[in-house]
Amino acid sequence: MKIFRQKMHESRNAERGRIMKKTYAKLMTAVMAAASILPAVPTAADETAESTLNVAIGSQFTTFDPALNTETANNYVLNHLYAGMFRKDADGNVQNELCESYEVSDDGLTYTFHISPDAKWSDGQQVTANDFVYSYLRALSYGADNAWAINDFVNFIEGAEEYSTAAQEEGESFDCTTADHSLVGIEAADDQTLVLKLKAPCAYLTGLMCANAWLPVREDFAVQHDSLWAFEGDYPTTGPYTLTECNETEKAVVDKNENYLNADDVTMDEITFLCMADKDAQALAYQTGEIDVALGISTDTALNYEGTDELWMVPKSSNYYLAINSAETGPEWAKNVDVRRALALAIDKESLVDVLGGDSFYPVLNGFVPEGVAGDTDTFRAEGDADGYTLTYDPDQAKELLAGAGYDESNPLHITYKYSNNGIHGDVATMLQQMWEAVGVEVDFECVESGVYYDQLDQGDFEICRYGYSAEDSPIQFLEMWTTGMQVVPAVNDEKFDQMIEDARQISDRSEYMKALHEAEDYLVEENVYVIPLLNFNDPALVQTYVEGQTMNGIYPYFAYVTVTE
């Protein structure tokens, strides 16, 4: 039996500071700016609040239900509302939070978690193991809308897949509080002890448990098969804040939770998250002092602040890559690995990055798993990069491969590149077209509204397209998305790759597990060129000079320990 104990959050008392104050003239400027570009909210300089912070994000909210959410905008808020058994620190390391200690059985199949006796809900009620049991069973029986969010439960928890399937067949009449779950590996041994039984060892279970779906929710507030309650506010939470106001298209306001396990370390009393999709309006609001933090600025704005203390490059475990539909619904050319390899070799990633704004914003990515995801002894990406790559820019070899596949000036390869009409995607499309045409490929564009883009990709409606994905828990979360079973309509259909991922899931030794995932990544990217990695993401943000102490909770900005000065 392996026993794990960790200290809870180290005290951050040293980070506490004074309440922000600004001059009356600055306040009036901010108020006038707010009248034209923002919903009515407290200004960043409002001295009536004990300690407040205004943070602008780029998208509106879709849900604050932990069982349902998979979107970044929601996570900015959820990250501050809930604490789970574990959390990720700024370096991506797993730290205990509500979990005081845990044990793992010798066969790696049973995890026993002991909840801290100091863990309480915001209304003062004790956090219990049954809260976690209800939350997990509710997530498994929610319905089809959260299939992606519960993927880790289904993959690893004993009986979870069968339970979820039965719940979905019964529909909304299924009641997780009364339905038999004796065959599901989720149980409360007592009020403070949660036991999880796995169907196979999982070397990174505690990392998975940092995700939203593993957070506790209360049965008396979080109803089954519905998420409307999550926008209503005034429900108990376990994290540093509670939701006190929400308009999902405009803003969410969170106030300090005095019953949070580490409440003494929380320095910011209130945070307002503002939905501001217009990047220029967000930059203007920052300039006038109406907002303290701007998380959704353009590269051009970021370049204007380059070299200043106000520019914060937010690290993001996200990849930007090209997916090729090599399966049944794809074109004939995409089934030829030499053609796929030629398209990869024709891309000058360094030039692509330079045009987009430089590697401070978009570092080149050669493997599929991006930076920021832990490997064995280093990041997974650093370990992979150390072995080198064969798919480096080589237009001459690209031409040779195309010729060998029967494509030349008299019979050029013709492809259709699909992308969505937002962000940097149009610029990327134009540069890719130029690079591919330089090796004799004719390129047409298909630009699609962002709201329907991913639905079309899920249905296999593309030849080659841009794609992106963010995760923080394990390299396997990036790789397994291209297994046949994880795709709605497969664009990659390779039994060997499927088996490589399945075999990796069975490995309990961390070093061997990571080795197996590196081999799977090489098979996906280098050997078969099913996908073409292009870029990592670093999101540029602006932070006023009077704001100090912003950090990361996993891959999301975290402001609970911020202080503000004059």
Question: Where is each model-derived feature located?
Answer:
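Long beta-strand-rich cores associated with HINT superfamily self-processing modules
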Residues: 541-566
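N-terminal lobe/hinge region of extracytoplasmic solute-binding protein
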Residues: 56-106, 236
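Structural transition elements
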Residues: 363-404, 422-425
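Gly/Pro-rich hinge or "lid" segments in bacterial periplasmic/extracellular proteins
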Residues: 90, 166-173, 181-183, 191-192, ...
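Ligand-site clamp/hinge motif
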Residues: 226, 259-304, 442
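Periplasmic-binding protein-like
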Residues: 333-375, 428, 521-533
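Extracytoplasmic/peripheral linker and loop segments enriched in polar/acidic and small residues
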Residues: 182, 353, 444-453, 477-545, ...
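Ligand/substrate-recognition segments at binding pockets and active sites
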Residues: 248, 399, 403-471, 539
